[in-house]
């Protein structure tokens, strides 16, 4: 992990949500604003360990979008977002998962 990324995690705010300590970090929450340098660092780290022999990068709605964007720009691979809401678009795939 880069020193800059480590410092950003060590210095992020932590809030209690019920009995859970939840850390607030720009890359996970977009709060405070996302530093482009952190996106650069994280996307480089992912490119070093992941195989991106793919046609499309897939990310979860909201939290994954900044990192998917950075990877897409660097790799020249389009990305798509898995969303909670259904739009009834042509070719849209509906997947349901129930937990708890």
Question: What does each of the following model-derived ranges do?
Answer:
Residues 1-53:
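Active-site-facing substrate-recognition patch
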Residues 40, 61-62:
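Short alpha-helix boundary/capping motifs
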Residues 44, 65-66:
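Residue-level marker for well-ordered alpha-helical positions
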Residues 51-54, 75-77:
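Short glycine/proline-enriched coil/turn segments at helix->beta-strand junctions
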Residues 53-61:
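Short glycine-rich phosphate-binding loop at a beta-alpha junction
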Residues 63-64, 85:
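Short glycine-rich anion-binding loops that position phosphate/pyrophosphate groups of nucleotides
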Residues 66-76:
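Short Gly/Thr/Asp-enriched flexible loops that form oxyanion-binding sites at enzyme active sites
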Residues 76-100:
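Short, glycine/charge-rich flexible loops or terminal/linker lids adjacent to PRPP-binding catalytic cores
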